[in-house]
Amino acid sequence: MNFVVIVSDTFRRDHLGCYGNEWIHTPNLDRLAAESVVFEQARAASFPTVPNRRDVLTGRFTFTYCDWAPLPPDEVVLAEVMGTAGYRTMMILDTPHIVAHGYNFSRGFHGWEWIRGQEHDEWRTSPRDPALPCAPEKLRRPETTVKQYLRNVADRRSEEDYFVARTMIQAMQWLEENLESQPFLLYVDTFDPHEPWDPPQRYVNLYDPGYQGEEVIYPRYAPCDFLSEPELKHVRALYAGEVTLVDTWVGRLLRRIDELGLRDDTAVIFTTDHGFYHGEHGLMGKSIIAEEFSCAVPLYDEVARIPLMIRAPGMKPGHRQAFAQPPDLMPTVLDLSGVRIPDTVQGTSLAPVLRGEEDHVRPLALTSHSIIYGPRAKRFTTITDGEWTLIYPGARFDPSQAAASSIVDSILRIEKATYAGAGGPELYHLPTDPAQRRNVFAEHRDTAARLHAQHVRMLEELGTPEEHLENRRLLAES
């Protein structure tokens, strides 16, 4: 069996029709979903970009022992294991963070192709001072990230020049040139729909035609009151346009798989690393990246819950309720290919769920910032059993690190009057409060204690070093 693994960065689950969206056009991914096992309870594990890819490629819950860091030479990775078993392995990506500056996530692949220019990739040097599309105070890193990006795309002329298009074109070309290299593992990683958001105008017109204001293509991560209502609507439209752009080009790759006669013996996996807040909880971004509130954002479902669909030969399509997380992808691929799963892997194969043999692989899911920094309130872990979700900051916290709502205005789009329960744990009952707006920790502390205890046991089973686990053994200081 061949494998094509597609990771699309910052892709909100609820922006896909197969997960219930009714206003964004995603016909190709919805078609893939109809032919796949779709995981309703797929959730991120290590957050954000680079930790997620390390989870995927090592099969480990890496937030328990590391953070955003290069891939070390001694960690067992999927490509090496598959290569040793006789697979031809290839990485094609435009996500710069996992290969630039010695990050080395290409290790183990027989070949890799980096499509240059995404985000702040230091690629092009002209124009020296490109004009910003809006007031700089509305942008994240306007003088560095945004201007570098504008240099990188200055000579873009057609849709084929966009990053996701270039990446999928390269993936199609590799398939065409390597038909004799079966079995293969093709890993495709596109940074879209991550910011900056500047899809072709025809995609934007689907969602906000006639807009005349500033183009906030890379909004700063902060409470969202810096945007007017029309700007916030347009930012959402830009992102939706990026989602449809990704759908278009992933669709072309899927069609090429069919045209090359590969479908009957090729598994396709589509997923992401995390989502994004577009005003939910009063926030813009996936976190707050600012000196005074760095990382002080709980990982609510808009960020923590992710799409995951797997189309594999012989598997019955349908929606499944089993928890699935990025560390599960490596053992799943190895299981389906008949390759022994290394002892280093902490994830669980989803193959029994794909075959309809099992309904669940674990009782709960953990989504977390790295926990290696000690007793900081700003390193949240989300613990869920599907009915209840506990947002846990560690036992000792500094309320000043979680007071972001105090600088948010009180207009209707700000959904929470207080933020992060003044820094303490938060508990939500998902069936009655899916938007996670009413913290019921005080009323259901016994439920919170149960989830917390399960989370500690899981961390122990993962071999979390005690120096990182110590601060997480207490639910909260009394």
Language-model segment annotations:
Residues V56-L57, D225-P230, L254-R255, E259, ...:
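Substrate-binding rim/cap in mid-to-C-terminal beta-strand-loop elements of soluble/periplasmic
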Residues M1-V5, S106-E113, K147-N152, R156-G213, ...:
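Active-site regions of oxyanion-processing enzymes, predominantly non-cytosolic
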Residues R53-R157:
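Catalytic-site neighborhoods of secreted/periplasmic enzymes
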Residues M1, V38, K416-G424, L430-A435, ...:
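Long, internal low-complexity/basic segments
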Residues I24, D198-G210, D258-H319, Q325:
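Histidine-centered active-site microenvironments of extracellular/periplasmic hydrolases
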Residues D301-E302, I371-F441, S478:
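C-terminal, low-complexity/hydrophilic appendages and adjacent surface loops
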Residues D161-L179, I217-T266, L336:
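A long, amphipathic alpha-helix that forms part
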Residues M1-E40, S46, R438-R445:
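Active-site-proximal N-terminal segment of extracellular/periplasmic enzymes that hydrolyze or transfer
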